[in-house]
Amino acid sequence: MAGHSDNDLGLPSFDKPVKVAIVIAPYYTSISEAQLAAARGVLDAADVAHETIEVPGSLEVPTAIGIAHRMSNFDGFVALGCVIRGATSHYDVVVNESSRALTMLGLQGICIGNGIITVETRDQAEERADGGRLNTAGGAAEAALHLIALTRSYGAPKGALGFKPRGTIEIADGSSQA
């Protein structure tokens, strides 16, 4: 995720339309509203089409992204939510597992900006959700756009990994086997 930094890459430009899904766990309403406004602002500024998908909690964000990636035509995703430490170890599970799952999806080539806020206090969450302050959601939207631009700069995928259909096996000498 892009965040508060002195390094401003600016927004990438695209020669073909881009479609992004904002996947958010709106557990804390006021924080979620600020996150959505910030992410949408960045995507609108880049003239990028976007849709919003709501899920119950931050643990469901990666699953929703995986489903949407397989079942739709989104070029990238912005993961949003907020996890504030409580009195139990549940915070650690949610923070670690949602981050791990988003990273695993990213390593599979899915363009994701991670804007899930993980903090100790509500004040810290509000500071990070504020589009005029730390703006983690806007930074996540920018990160997703930069990953989409990077992916497009390399052209079409080189091909799928896995088994070829029966009858398409190629032998080293150039012949094929049915």
UniProtKB/Swiss-Prot annotation:
Please state what class of enzyme this protein is: transferase
> What InterPro entries does this protein map onto?
LS, LS/RS, LS/RS_sf
Per UniProt, (2S)-2-hydroxy-3-oxobutyl phosphate binds at: A87, T88, R128
Record bears the keyword Transferase: yes
Which annotated residues bind 5-amino-6-(D-ribitylamino)uracil? Y27, S58, L59, E60, C82, V83, I84, N114
Q: Where is the active site?
A: H90 (proton donor)
Pathway(s) it belongs to: Cofactor biosynthesis; riboflavin biosynthesis; riboflavin from 2-hydroxy-3-oxobutyl phosphate and 5-amino-6-(D-ribitylamino)uracil: step 1/2
Catalysis performed (reactions): (2S)-2-hydroxy-3-oxobutyl phosphate + 5-amino-6-(D-ribitylamino)uracil = 6,7-dimethyl-8-(1-D-ribityl)lumazine + phosphate + 2 H2O + H(+)
What top-level branch of life does the organism fall under? Bacteria
- Which Gene Ontology terms of cellular component type are present? cytosol; riboflavin synthase complex
Keywords noted in UniProt: Riboflavin biosynthesis, Transferase
Asked if the record carries the keyword Transferase, the reply is yes
Q: What is its EC number?
A: 2.5.1.78
Mind listing the GO biological process terms from this record? riboflavin biosynthetic process
Molecular function (Gene Ontology), one example: 6,7-dimethyl-8-ribityllumazine synthase activity
Task: Sum up the protein's function in the record's words.
Answer: Catalyzes the formation of 6,7-dimethyl-8-ribityllumazine by condensation of 5-amino-6-(D-ribitylamino)uracil with 3,4-dihydroxy-2-butanone 4-phosphate. This is the penultimate step in the biosynthesis of riboflavin.
* Similarity comment: family membership: Belongs to the DMRL synthase family.
Q: What is this protein called?
A: 6,7-dimethyl-8-ribityllumazine synthase
Q: Taxonomically, what lineage is the organism?
A: Bacteria, Pseudomonadati, Pseudomonadota, Alphaproteobacteria, Rhodobacterales
The gene is: ribH
